[in-house]
Amino acid sequence: MKLELIGHDEKYALEQSLLTLFPGEKPVYGTVDKTADTRWARVTLTEEDERVQVTTELGMDGKSAAHSYDYPLSGTEYEKEGQRRHAVGISFFGAAKDLLGISPAWGSLTGVRPAKVALSLIREGGKKRAEKELQELYCVTPARARLAIEAADAGIRAAAELGCEAVWIMDD
């Protein structure tokens, strides 16, 4: 698949999604020609006022879809880099989901431990909100969202019993 990156160089997030959603496709980086290329994605990242916006245009065999995702940037430059990567992944996943008409059970959570994402979401807003965000933002099925919450909760309980700050499988 021809991949054109505009305003960024977030290849890893795209390659993870490509492997999951388009098995057998190999990334080829360059300028997309919508008339000549049969399988392509153009992923554009812009930043303004401490927000990142990523728009993915995706085409395959004459069909196409587009998805935009806007996300606030905050914290250190390292944290912002992760937020940019997150936005690229969600944008690409949204376009692929629309194009293919399917969504994997773990949604857009590729290349990450779902319980780690669930733990972060629990810390930000509790279990109910975390389960809702896993389903709505990451497109995780309800059963898998509950499983991720249960795994994160088990890690929290284990850490409390052991007197640890965090359990290694969920810590950064």
Enumerate the language-model features and the residues they cover.
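A structural signal for isolated positions on well-ordered beta-strands in alpha/beta enzyme cores
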Residues: 2-4, 167
